[in-house]
A protein has these predicted regions:
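Core segments of small alpha/beta cavity-forming domains
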Residues: 48-140, 234-236
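Surface-exposed, charged secondary-structure patches
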Residues: 124-176
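Low-complexity, intrinsically disordered terminal/linker segments enriched in charged
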Residues: 170-239
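N-terminal Sec-pathway targeting helices
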Residues: 5-22
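A short, structured loop/turn motif at beta-sheet edges
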Residues: 146-159, 188-200, 266-271
Length: 300
């Protein structure tokens, strides 16, 4: 029995030695072969990563180019529709006619009704404000810059900036005045296909902060109106505020809080105080446009 165990142990030792010799021989052969390969035949890790990166970039360029082209074409359609809607509203500022605005809003929906009603209030207010001061708007234009488009089926959310430009004169004067401001919008639209198979859009919600919002609560509409009449008359004795001087800092208060501040930048052709403000990027705007004068105060 003892002799048998001794023989098995000897065999195991020999097998282990043989296995180790085989492994060492394989490694030696491997490194010998590597040493025979010229350096120019090596492929570095950097070259491999560069090749992979180049392939990925080619794919991204192709896919992004296609995607950007699709987005660009779609944004052009949206920009055309939104610009048309905004400039139709601007025409309503000038002439009071609002019947064409119904074509841009889905008036069967509560959100769209609210949005259209708000535009009616803005139109009525601006017309009354200008008439009372004997101001005549000669042109109002909007430039639409789309920042982002999010599409989910036929629902489209557009983040955009609207750049307003107003030109006006005072009654019985020829000198032209102009001012501008910017309003950021979050606009929700829905797309649909008309009878001709063309894609069309309708406005559902239009959320934005507004320079006019302090003076709109006096107006109510039924959304059956086709034109908005004046509710005020020309005041030939309208007294221009004399409490503010150039470079004064003024604040616009809402309830117990200051909404924003502005600087008196100068005066228009009739001596009307104008303001500049970082809020809405306001430039040379009549100081009380959109605000009750009692809420406009010097900021000490």
């Amino acid at each position: 029995m003892f002799s048998l165990n001794k023989n098995n142990k000897t065999k195991n030792i020999l097998s282990l030695i043989l296995y180790c010799f085989l492994v060492i021989s394989l490694f030696a052969h491997f490194f010998y072969c590597i040493g025979k390969v010229p350096p120019s035949h090596y492929v570095s890790k950097n070259n491999i990563l560069s090749a992979v990166s180049a392939s990925a970039n080619i794919f991204n360029i192709n896919s992004n180019t296609t995607l950007n082209e699709n987005i660009s074409v779609y944004e052009e359609k949206l920009t055309k529709f939104i610009s048309s809607a905004f400039n139709e509203r601007n025409n309503s500022f000038l002439n009071g006619s609002v019947y064409k605005l119904y074509n841009y809003y889905g008036t069967s929906d509560a959100n769209a009704k609210y949005s259209l009603d708000y535009e009616f209030k803005r139109i009525a207010y601006l017309r009354d404000w200008s008439l009372e001061r004997s101001i005549i708007f000669t042109s109002i234009n909007s430039l639409v810059i789309i920042n982002k488009v999010t599409k989910n089926n036929n629902k489209i959310i557009v983040n955009l900036d609207e750049y307003y430009n107003f030109n006006y004169i005072h009654n019985k004067q020829f000198a032209s005045n102009k001012f501008s401001f910017t309003i950021p919008h979050i606009l929700t639209l829905y797309s649909y296909t008309n009878d001709l198979g063309e894609e069309c859009f309708i406005i559902d919600k239009d959320y934005y902060s507004d320079v006019f919002n302090d003076e709109l609560n006096d107006y109510n509409f039924y959304l059956t109106e086709t034109s908005l009449p004046y509710t005020k008359k020309i005041n030939p004795n309208y007294k221009v505020s004399e409490q503010f001087n150039k470079n004064d800092i003024i604040r616009f208060d809402k309830s117990l809080f200051t909404d924003h501040k502005a600087i008196i930048s100068g005066y228009d052709s009739n001596g009307y105080p104008l303001i500049d403000s970082n809020s809405f990027n306001i430039s040379n705007m009549p100081f009380d446009l959109g605000w009750k004068e009692k809420n406009i105060k010097l900021s000490y």
